[in-house]
Amino acid sequence: MSVDLPTPERSLLTEQDVRRIVREEVAGVIAKDPGSRQAAIIASKGTLDWAYPPLILATAAAAAGMQTAVFFTFYGLNIIHKDFARKLKVDPVGNPAMPMPVPMPDLVTAMPGMVSLASKMMRSRFARHNVASIATLLDSARELDVRLIGCQMTIDVFGYTQDEFIDGVEFAGAAAFMSVARRSNVTLFV
């Protein structure tokens, strides 16, 4: 399948470009296999850098016409927790792939204040490139009818209550999510 990519004059992909490309690719797959209309994603990490992949993938799949569910378990619950969702941070310690304007030794990244600095840098870089915020991606996911499923066992283990999560979250255990995943043609663990 041929996809129109950005021209040299416009070298950055926008969120709309990504959604269009994914929609075209998924439409091609669905045309070949009409049963391939479901996606299941597991979000198990709750830092700013790990919140983006499951939400971008989920909204792209839903925008392409796929029934999509994201299962938030363990620290992934932070993404949908009312108190934590707006305060997600990225930790540069032990993250050698994290792009920094100036290479820094691990000792420097462990200094007080570096987590806040790295988080601010990531948010500003994403904003400069018109990448939606986590709050916006969550709103988009709900508008696109993505099922946001909080792991009930993890909620119980961590001592949370269902009231502590954003509106629109369903609560279920791993067995219920496995039923969703079993019927899905795309299953991702992020």
Model feature map: region roles:
Residues V115-A172, A176:
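A charged, amphipathic interaction segment
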Residues T68-F74, C151-Q152:
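Short internal beta-strands
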Residues I41-A51, R125-R128:
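Short, glycine-rich nucleotide/cofactor-binding loops
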Residues L88-F126, N130-S133:
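A glycine-rich helix N-cap at a beta->alpha junction
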